[in-house]
């Protein structure tokens, strides 16, 4: 019964009354990207755009995304919840409401949002609700958080296109990806940043559906 209760708590989003209080102070993290040496927290060059992707554990997702040409910098962090400046330990309780996300700062002149969305939908399973593979909890839910209306429209169109593609291949599950305007983004602790560059044999839980997303190039 205890294990069932713990499972249920980790898969139900908290409300304002049950969310952890957090703190005013930012959690210390790296200042530069371990791979590229670029500023992790900005300022970013003029013309760059941002998007947040939740694909389960952010270690593998971040590596996947920093390797895409046209991506200026990436960072692991937390978003979509209620608790200000959460720690990793707090997010794993399910009581912050946040999901693990990767901040992607990209040059739209070199890589389109469609290209990024195609990678997002193909490289994880966006139909699993409050989990990704063996990683269970609200902190592993699929999410896209955007910064303007144009991005929002593109994200919704990509979701619809991928849902149709899933049905063609007899996948009857519904996409559960949360798509919304971005709220606060909180940088994860230093040891999470570019984790798989520092630990090449570390855990990567990315598993796609095997279905192509029919958008972009």
Swiss-Prot record:
Pfam families: PMSR (PF01625)
Top-level lineage group: Bacteria
Coiled coil: none
UniProt keyword Transcription, yes or no: no
Molecular function in Gene Ontology: L-methionine-(S)-S-oxide reductase activity; peptide-methionine (S)-S-oxide reductase activity
Its EC number(s): 1.8.4.11
Catalytic residues, chain numbering: 57
GO cellular component: cytoplasm
Keywords associated with the record: Oxidoreductase
Protein's GO biological process: cellular response to oxidative stress; protein modification process
Catalysis: reaction(s): L-methionyl-[protein] + [thioredoxin]-disulfide + H2O = L-methionyl-(S)-S-oxide-[protein] + [thioredoxin]-dithiol; [thioredoxin]-disulfide + L-methionine + H2O = L-methionine (S)-S-oxide + [thioredoxin]-dithiol
Record field: transmembrane: none
SUPFAM superfamilies referenced in this protein's UniProt entry, alphabetically: Peptide methionine sulfoxide reductase
Protein's job: Has an important function as a repair enzyme for proteins that have been inactivated by oxidation. Catalyzes the reversible oxidation-reduction of methionine sulfoxide in proteins to methionine.
Family from the record: Belongs to the MsrA Met sulfoxide reductase family.
Protein name, UniProt field: Peptide methionine sulfoxide reductase MsrA 1
Species name: Rhizobium meliloti (strain 1021)
């Amino acid at each position: 019964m205890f294990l069932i209760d713990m499972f249920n708590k980790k898969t139900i989003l908290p409300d304002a009354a049950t969310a952890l209080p957090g703190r005013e102070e930012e959690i210390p993290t790296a200042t530069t990207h371990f791979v590229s040496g670029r500023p992790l927290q900005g300022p970013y060059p003029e013309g760059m755009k941002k998007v947040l992707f939740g694909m389960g554990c952010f270690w593998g997702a971040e590596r996947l995304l920093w390797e895409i040409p046209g991506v200026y910098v990436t960072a692991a962090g937390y978003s979509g919840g209620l608790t200000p400046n959460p720690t990793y330990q707090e997010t794993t309780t399910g009581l912050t409401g946040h999901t693990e996300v990767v901040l992607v700062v990209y040059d739209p002149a070199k890589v389109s949002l469609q290209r990024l969305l195609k990678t997002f939908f193909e490289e994880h399973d966006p139909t699993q609700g409050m989990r990704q593979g063996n990683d269970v909890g609200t902190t592993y839910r699929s999410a896209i958080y955007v910064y303007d209306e144009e991005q929002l429209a593109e994200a919704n169109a990509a979701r619809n296109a991928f849902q149709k593609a899933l049905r063609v291949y007899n996948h009857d599950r519904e996409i559960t990806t949360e798509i919304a305007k971005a709220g606060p983004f909180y940088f994860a602790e230093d040891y999470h940043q570019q984790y798989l560059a520092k630990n090449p044999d570390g855990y990567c839980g990315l598993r796609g559906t095997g279905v192509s997303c029919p958008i972009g190039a």
